[in-house]
Structure formats: C-alpha cells, structure tokens
Amino acid sequence: GPLYMTYDVRDLANFTDTEMTANAFLSLWKRMPWGEKTTLNGIIMVDPVVVQALVKVTGDVKLPDGTVLNGNNNAQFMMNTVYTEHEPEETNAYFGIVAKACVGTLMKHMDMKTIGSLAKDLRTLAKERHLAMYSFTPSLEDLIKAAGFSATLHTDKVNPTLGVYLTEQNPSKMGWYIKRSTKIKQICTDSAPYKYQVEYTLENTLKEDEVGKLSWYITGQFPYNEGASLDKVFFYPPYGGELSNFKVQGTGSVPAMDSFNAAIMYRSLAQ
C-alpha cells in the first residue's frame, strides 16, 4: 500500500486508525517470545506532549544533571534538548527517568482533583492526536471510542474535516525544526457552496550554518539529506467530498491519487 512500511515496530504508528495500529502490534506481539504466552489487553500511544501534560499535573521532575522539567519545557527537552546536550546512547535512560518519575508521582497523588485535571487535558490531547488508546475488550473499546480516545478517519458530513498525515522518512530528529501551518479560505459559489482552498506549509527553521553544529543523530546520517526533513504526506478528503487542483511550491512532489483501507487519499513527498 501507499505507506510502504518497513518491519520496524515504530512504523506501526503510521496508520490513520488506532484499531489498525493495535491489530498490527498484536500480530507482532504474538510472534515474540515474551508475547506469545501473554495476553495483550490493548495499546496506549503517547508522545512527549502527553508526558508534559502529566508533569504539569504531577509536579516537576529533577534529572540527575540538575535539569528541572516542568509543564512548559518537558516536551522541548524530550524532542530536542536531550539530543543536543547528550549522547545518543544516553537518551533512552533520560526518557526512562522522566517516565518513572511521572508515573510514581501520579500514583502517589491520585485524587479527584488530579483525575479531573488529567481528564480535561487528555481529551484535548487525544483530539490533537498526541494520545490514542485501543482495547481488545469490545465493551471497553466502545467506551474508549465514545470518549474520543481511539483515533479514526473522520466520517462526519456535517462537520467535514480534511486529513493531513505526515511520517518522517529521513532517520533523524528533524521534526522539531519543521514548522507546519494551515490556511483555509472558503471560496464557495452558487454551484459549489462548500468549496474551500487549503494551503498546507512545511518550513524548515534550521539554519544552514547551524547544521554542522549538531550531531548526525539530529540532522540525519545521509549526506544528501543532512539537516533536511523528508516527509511522506498523505491527504485525505473530507468524508463525502473530494480534493482537486493540487499546486506545489518548493521541493515537494505533486500529490498522486492512491487508496488505503478502501479510502481514497493522495500521497506526496516533501523535503
């Protein structure tokens, strides 16, 4: 299909639906020595923005080197600073320290106030696709999906939504430096009352003279892509609608029509 995924488990997060990610992970789980005799109840996917929300509720985290992470700087640390200030082999240890501290503090202060604050934040994070869950227990999954925690393609004609999905193709940590923005302008006419012009922009904010100052782990190990992001971009039309008249400026390819899981979409590659 258009995803062209490898056998790397990290590719599983590329699916647009959490259910597809969960089923793919379950398939791998059953093939692993540590998974074949252990039942997998479900999956939870989070990114550093979710961890930052946890720190905001549970309290600051102090790292061994004296760095203090809080509800404002945690995401930047985990997505960028940890790579600029530490060697690649040290980064996983820092992630473990932060995760352990968050969970420990959360369990220690699990009261109604904490639960209320988390619930409000988690709904927003799920809507923005920083957080997703799926349960293999049907009755529980119904509740999770109803609460908006199992991501799916939008199928609401009343509130049409254009889907734009990106996945990095240059093994690097360049995502932090890519500014993504969207402009939407309604250009409806009598014959087409629900017509919009959408402009989606990817801007690399890393200056050329800064590339050499960063490690290959951040900028990428391939000379032809060093300091550049290479994004595979998928565009999904609003449910019941269509996309047309693509125009590209810069080094992106013109989106080509494709399909995935019986849904029409358009794929492009942008550097």
Question: Where are the regions that the model predicts?
Answer:
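Non-catalytic, solvent-exposed segments at the cell envelope interface
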Residues: G1-Q271
